A protein has these predicted regions:
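Bacterial Sec-dependent N-terminal signal peptides
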Residues: 1-20
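Flexible, low-complexity junctional segments that flank or bridge functional domains
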Residues: 18-224, 242-243, 254-259, 272, ...
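Loop/turn-rich, solvent-exposed surfaces of beta-rich toroidal or solenoidal domains
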Residues: 228-235
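Short glycine/proline-centered loop/turn elements that form peptide/ligand docking sites
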Residues: 289
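A recognition module on extended beta-rich or small alphabeta surfaces enriched in W/G with H and D/E
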Residues: 322-342
Length: 367
């Protein structure tokens, strides 16, 4: 009931704001969104180029005109504006609600699996068959914990199974730290991962300084800040290295074969996990029906501005992958599976072994 009360309070607050704000206040909110994005968004120069610059200018003017006539609210038009960039790391929230998502272009829409099946991927570590073990890893945000991740690996190694399935359906990322033990387990050859560039705006630098101070000024952050200040005339500054090696001291004898199961909701850090596995593990095959979401090119999102009148919050990514300067984008298509699963959606995806998992296990066990 307490949660319901909070939601209702937020809904009432939004409604009151919509009734009380003047056109001038809505325009002020919208103009702040545009200014913040144009000045600080790490994807702006890649998303707005000579081919679509005029279309962008016209779209922006059209949206502002809709606010000026009172036809739309500043928050809603700001959300529609941010959706123009088709980047799930660039968004506006209001009371915990992602306002940008509903305006995303069709090719970036998220499928509502939960409308047709019981969809609540939950952590799980168990045998599927005598030869294949399942670890369901639905988040890189702390649930499951690092300790659980390590225990799941221990359970697998003690199971006697040759094959391993890691099911990451529904995993929309968090922190890379959580998947690293799985990467080490599946690693079988040295590989590389591409670094990121920091969009060196004054506001982004200041945000970086504030984060460093809040964390006790760790060396890796103070080193970045020093380079940002020394390179104030450079639009982008390499965070660490353009490419980094992925190498572990040993190679685990198990699993003999490994599978990762994905769906459209896999994004951000979970996509980075896939890229690093593709770079370092010949024994791992990616299975799925849909490509991943594509939410990895622009990252390190920060709260950029609370809009002064409607009180919604704008979030902006500060970094971009070095792939972007090479004309390579993951966000455009997402990451495709190596093997397409041509089955109906499972009846439910919770903390049980579902039909897709059984099918993948049988595929791994083919001689």
């Amino acid at each position: 009931m307490k949660q319901l009360f909070v939601i209702l309070t937020l809904l009432v607050t939004v409604t009151l704001n919509a009734q009380e704000l003047t056109v001038e206040q809505h325009l002020e909110d919208f103009d702040i969104v545009v200014r913040q994005v144009e000045e600080n968004y790490s994807g702006f120069t890649a998303k707005v180029d000579s081919l679509n610059h005029l279309a962008y200018i016209n779209f922006k003017a059209e949206l502002r005109g809709q606010v000026g006539t009172g036809a739309k609210r500043g928050r809603d038009v700001g959300a529609e504006y941010t959706a123009f960039f088709a980047d799930y790391h660039l968004f506006i929230t209001d009371g915990g609600f992602n306002c940008t998502q509903e305006y995303m272009p069709k090719h970036k829409q998220i499928p509502h699996y939960w409308d047709s099946i019981e969809y609540h991927p939950s952590k799980l570590a168990c045998k599927v068959t005598d030869r294949t073990f399942l670890i369901r890893f639905p988040s890189c945000s702390g649930d499951p914990t690092i300790d659980w991740v390590k225990e799941s690996i221990k359970s697998y190694l003690q199971s006697g199974c040759d094959n391993l399935i890691i099911d990451i359906r529904g995993n929309n990322g968090g922190q890379d730290t959580y998947y690293k033990p799985y990467l080490e387990l599946l690693y079988d050859h040295m590989g590389t991962t591409e670094g990121v560039e920091f969009y060196n705006s004054e506001a982004n630098r200041e945000a970086c300084i504030q984060v460093a101070e809040s964390r006790g000024n760790p060396k890796w952050l103070t080193s970045l800040i020093k380079r940002l200040k020394e390179s104030e005339n450079d639009t982008f500054v390499i965070w660490d290295e353009e490419t980094s090696s992925i190498e572990y001291d040993s190679i685990s004898s198990k699993p003999i074969k490994a599978a990762i199961i994905i769906d459209r909701l896999v994004s951000s850090s979970a996509e980075q996990m896939l890229l690093e596995l593709k770079a370092t593990s010949h024994r791992t095959t990616i299975y799925g029906q849909d490509n991943t979401l594509g939410c990895i090119d622009f990252s390190n999102t920060r709260p950029a501005a609370q809009l002064p009148n409607c009180k919604a919050m704008l979030y902006i990514p500060m970094t971009r992958s070095v792939r972007i300067a090479k004309g390579i984008s993951i966000d455009e298509t997402g990451i495709k599976p190596d093997v397409r699963i041509k089955l109906p959606l499972p009846k439910n995806l919770t903390d049980i072994i579902d039909e897709w998992t059984v099918w993948v296990a049988h595929d791994l066990e083919k001689e």
